[in-house]
Amino acid sequence: MNSSSFYSLLQKKFPFQPTYKQDIFFQKIAIFLTEADNNTIFVLKGYAGTGKTTVISTIVNSLLDINKKYVLLAPTGRAAKVIANYSNKPAFTIHKKIYFPKKSSGGAVSFTLQQNKHTNTIFIVDEASMISDTNSDSKLYENGSLLDDLISYVYSGTNCKMILLGDTAQLPPVNLDISPALDIRTLGMNYNKEVEHIELDEVMRQEENSGILHNATELRELLKDSFIDEFKFDVKKFKDIVRLTDGYDIQDAINSAYSNYSIEDTAFIVRSNKRANQYNEQIRTKILGKESELSTGDFLMVVKNNYFWLKDSDEAGFIANGDIIEVLEIFNIKELYGFKFAKVKIRMIDYPNQIPFETVLLMDTIKSESPSLTYEESNRLYQEVLKDYEGETKFKQFQKVKVNEYFNGLQVKFSYAITCHKSQGGQWNTVFIEQPYLPDGINRDYIRWLYTAMTRAKNKLYLIGFKDESFVE
């Protein structure tokens, strides 16, 4: 099938009248998918509500017509679950797909890039704004970074190409100013690829009554300005975005979100770990009535990658920073090595096929204001565990610490309230956002933070602690 016939087919299969930009996208993608050249990357950028998911579902459901296969990928388990839900097709995390874990004799894990055995396959990668081109975890990243490895993996396959999807108004990866996987110059210059791209910027007619999208689009437009001095929410004419000022109203809203939907379909997004800790404590005691330091039914977020507890054949492969778990059983809580640990049975909520398993939680990170154990704390734990194996050779000691279950305890925090970076790639039915402390006033970083937080909400958004002047009269 040539590109013009494929373009006609895409138009036919698309469930709506395409917007001007969507139509151009279909023309461009039809050429990209039918031409033989394998040195091109396609970047589809799009604001919230502009139909990225709908056009991509149409593509996925049409690839068979041109004898192409597809693989759906995302940076996190939660983001993979989102793309799987909207496309009704299986999706994987990038890590699970492209890396092969190797355990050394010492018990340490290192990851090797897998061989891409796919042929005639289009790799569709969602939430690409989260993909970094810097080396942040030396256990991974053969070529220096996740983006390097992803491009290297995909384009080493026979007739394989990649479509990167994302929204440049979202927060970039930690410590970066831009999202390199959506940056046309970075992709062209650093990876020696041709880059075809388009940005969808018209909100679809079906979404025009959404207050969440109306306000998100206003924020998105602000980012085009060179100077940003204020933003006012427009909540009056919308039912899906609500301002809360009274403590009792906040409690009622959280209660009803938990009972009408579920705890795991509700997120409370704040600016710092300190605020998240405070809200988690309040929510657990006042709303969920949990008095002990850990209870069955508690939801926690893992805050550091952990390669110890799962086998490669498990659905998740490893337990990643940002994965949410539910505590099903608590066997014991004890102090050891100067730290506190809980032996528990958990399920991973973003991996429905992952069988629940027993593990050890490191409790000290729950109240900590740092994102995970500090270097000093990790070192202290290492030295204490090492004492258990005195009298062994240095190498034996090292080997035994590496497989000690307490040394490998999952670092966790409660996940009722989380920071915005941790929420990225996820969607929740109900989202609460607290106005952060802004010592420098409103700036571009804050607008991106707010935009990212707001667009995590599918149906209802509550705004807490925002001043009167933050709203349209």
Across the structure, where does each feature detected by a protein language model lie?
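Short, solvent-exposed amphipathic alpha-helical segments in soluble enzyme
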Residues: 88, 283-287, 448-452
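Short, conserved phosphate/pyrophosphate- and ester-handling motifs at nucleotide-, phospho-/glycolipid
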Residues: 22, 76, 272, 425
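C-terminal accessory regions
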Residues: 337-473
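Conserved SAM-binding loop
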Residues: 18, 72, 268
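Conserved pre-motif I regulatory segment
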Residues: 2-40
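Short beta-alpha junctions and helix-cap segments that line functional grooves
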Residues: 75, 311-314, 445-450
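Conserved helicase motor core of P-loop NTPases
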Residues: 6, 25, 29, 37-38, ...
